[in-house]
């Protein structure tokens, strides 16, 4: 550190004590919020962080027809009447995780349209892995300038083997979410094994999925014949 740079100096004290409440993980809650769109029912998420990305995802879910309520770090999502997979740029351009709605919209509605996703500027962060995976599952996708226009034909999404070029967390999550709307099992090779993937798998199991290998880098998911519509608290 240069002499002219600002610095924070921490001095030791005799004792540290007290209690703090840790905020829930944004990286876990956003994909679970996206996956809640798969379910024609209510999902309640506790210890949900009060941050801009969470509220942006809430706005996107409302655009899809969900009823969303947030009060004192508790998020209630009712996707019973959700009927739309076409998003505008009011919220989707504000955060990267908007792309996670591709899997749930294709799985439930068979249609997904979104302008280029936004988010923090951390170098180049293309959505190629997401698009390639959805195509392998059977979606027809076009787009320009980073946006996406996707639909599923009359045969629907079909479970398959997907090998990711890189263990992308977001692409892994999108594969898992989309696989819930596919016929048959899906295997994801070179998948991410980060904790936020584990959390998503826990939620998808509550919807009725059978999942193996989420901590190994190779995941197999078999969707239920009918997604659980009972209220879920997570």
Can you describe what each PLM-predicted range is?
Residues 1-234:
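Structural preference for solvent-exposed beta-strand-turn elements
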């Amino acid at each position: 550190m240069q002499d002219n740079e600002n610095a924070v100096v921490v001095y030791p004290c005799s004792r540290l004590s007290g209690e703090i409440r840790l905020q829930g993980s944004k990286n876990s809650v956003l994909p679970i919020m996206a996956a809640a769109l798969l379910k024609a029912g209510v999902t309640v998420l506790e210890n949900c962080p009060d941050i801009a990305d969470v509220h942006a995802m809430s706005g996107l879910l409302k655009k899809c027809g969900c009823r969303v309520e947030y009060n004192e770090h508790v998020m209630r999502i009712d996707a019973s009447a959700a009927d739309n997979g076409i998003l505008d740029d009011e919220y989707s351009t504000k955060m990267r995780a908007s792309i996670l709605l591709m899997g749930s919209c294709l799985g439930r509605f068979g249609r997904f349209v979104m302008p280029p996703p936004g988010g923090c500027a951390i170098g180049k962060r293309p959505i190629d892995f997401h698009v390639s995976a959805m195509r392998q599952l059977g979606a027809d996708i076009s787009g320009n300038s980073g946006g996406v226009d996707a639909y599923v034909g009359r045969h629907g999404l079909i479970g398959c083997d997907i090998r990711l070029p890189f263990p992308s967390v977001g692409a892994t999550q999108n594969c898992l979410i989309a696989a819930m709307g596919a016929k048959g099992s899906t295997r994801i090779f070179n998948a991410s094994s980060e904790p936020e993937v584990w959390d998503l798998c826990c939620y998808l199991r509550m919807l009725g999925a059978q999942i193996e290998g989420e901590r190994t880098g190779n995941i197999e998911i078999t969707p239920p014949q009918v997604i659980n519509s009972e209220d879920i608290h997570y």
